[in-house]
Amino acid sequence: MDPKKRVSSLKQYPVLAVFTLFFAALFVLDLVTPDRAYSELENTTLTQRPKLTAVSVDGLNNYFTNYTKYVKDQVFGRDQWISLQSLAETTLFQKTQSGGILLGREHRMFARSYRVLPTEERVWNKNLAAVQSLGERYPGKVSFMLVPSASVLYPEDLPLAAPQMDEEGRIDEAQAALPAVQFLRVTDALRAHKDEYLYYRTDHHWTTLGAYYAYEQFCEAQGLTPFDRSAHPVETAENFYGTHYSKARTWNAEPDTITWYDLPNRLTIWNITAPGQPTEGTQTGLYDTGKLDVYDKYAMFLHGNNGLSRVEGDGTGKILVIKDSYANSFVPYLTANYAAIDVVDFRNYNYGLDQLIADNDYDAILVLYSYSSFTSDPYLYRAGVAG
């Protein structure tokens, strides 16, 4: 076709002309934009350009399958396209969930939990037995804190008629099943302050303030004087988008703020090669502030989920904390009460506890888990294994 006639045709169909120019520009931008290895906002690895390694039917099929994934992951403006999709779904179609996340009022996001799955029930019973066994082996020393999800505190902010299962009733069941431990019911303590900033809107964790109110209840049960927040400077970090956001990617999400207390206490992360044989690894401060420059800002607390670490405190005696990541923002408060706070995370600690406890003669043992982790962590059973 004559170029002049082509231009004339495009003038007759301006929408077609706009789309043609748009896709041509997008094609050029895709060519010149460097590939990304990782999406911070989605918290996922992105597909890289595949290589054709075998000229065969299967080889070509695999190549084109992977190339389709590559184009999808590396398209120019991927983050913005996802946000635009979210805008359309929530405004035009009134969508109230995305990626397994419920989109609630006040910009809150909640993990969807309609019922207890059989696999969760098995893990739940196994973990209850482990905590009970630990309490029986160390009578009078073990406390258990099972932290409710944000949906328990803010049911009014859930989408209309969202059928969340009865998590608070399950916590009651846990208390009845654990007569050998001191059960710390933190739900009521948190509910008394529910108008405050207790849980992140875009993440599954509680905030540093939520952790403090639970810590106060622990101190009351142990007869301890709580950490004096007014005596320490507060640090803040803005623009935190958590794990709920990375799954839902809602267009109008409000970022969270992380706070922490600037404490001089030291943290030692141990290398473990056998039960009772820790070798000193990294010595550092309580916070990895370098994490504030990346997506997973919450990992700044205690440098993430280390298998075994020790915090040097300003009090007396020793405590062992067996935990999930909820405890990472809780543990710094214990520096006011204990001289040594040992922290075990079974996701990265492959041994039992008896040798560790025998070597350190702890004054107290605290098991601290969120409800969601307690129903899904397949490693906590090690706490119930003698040896």
Language-model region placement:
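Extracellular glycan-modifying ectodomains
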Residues: M1-G387
